[in-house]
């Protein structure tokens, strides 16, 4: 979350000033990359909030898996080629690179959780439990 705050402070402050002096192609790349940066960070934050909800017992892992499909991670790292990317302000490049690394880590963790969730045994209803319930129902007042 600190990276989200750092990116917001940069984009609303010094980044805005730096973008005004960029050549046209780099200014367009700046706009694209800043949107990708914020989207990437919001997706990571959403994923982290889901995991926190599971850890705090607010959601089951199955419920989180169902919600997880709303979090869309893009495999595209940057919104422009490396030549234009190098023309962007150093701070934007740094924030973008850090956000991509975090997204890659989250995607790896997410994949690990998906694999672990798919290996969880499905609790089958036993015949004995079913018969006990029928007996209780038959003899209850």
What are these language model-derived features?
Residues 1-141:
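Surface-exposed peri-terminal alpha-helical interaction modules
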């Amino acid at each position: 979350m600190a990276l989200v705050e750092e990116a917001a402070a940069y984009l609303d402050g010094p980044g805005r000033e730096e973008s005004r002096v960029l050549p046209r192609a780099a200014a367009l790349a700046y706009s694209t990359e800043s949107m990708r940066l914020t989207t990437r960070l919001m997706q990571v934050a959403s994923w982290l909030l889901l995991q926190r909800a599971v850890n705090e017992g607010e959601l089951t892992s199955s419920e989180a898996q169902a919600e997880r499909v709303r979090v869309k991670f893009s495999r595209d790292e940057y919104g422009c080629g490396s030549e234009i990317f190098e023309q962007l302000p150093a701070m934007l490049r740094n924030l973008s690179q850090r956000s991509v690394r975090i997204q890659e880590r989250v995607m790896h963790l997410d994949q690990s959780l998906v694999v672990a969730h798919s290996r969880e045994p499905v609790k089958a209803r036993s015949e004995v439990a079913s018969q006990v319930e029928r007996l209780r129902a038959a003899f209850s007042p």
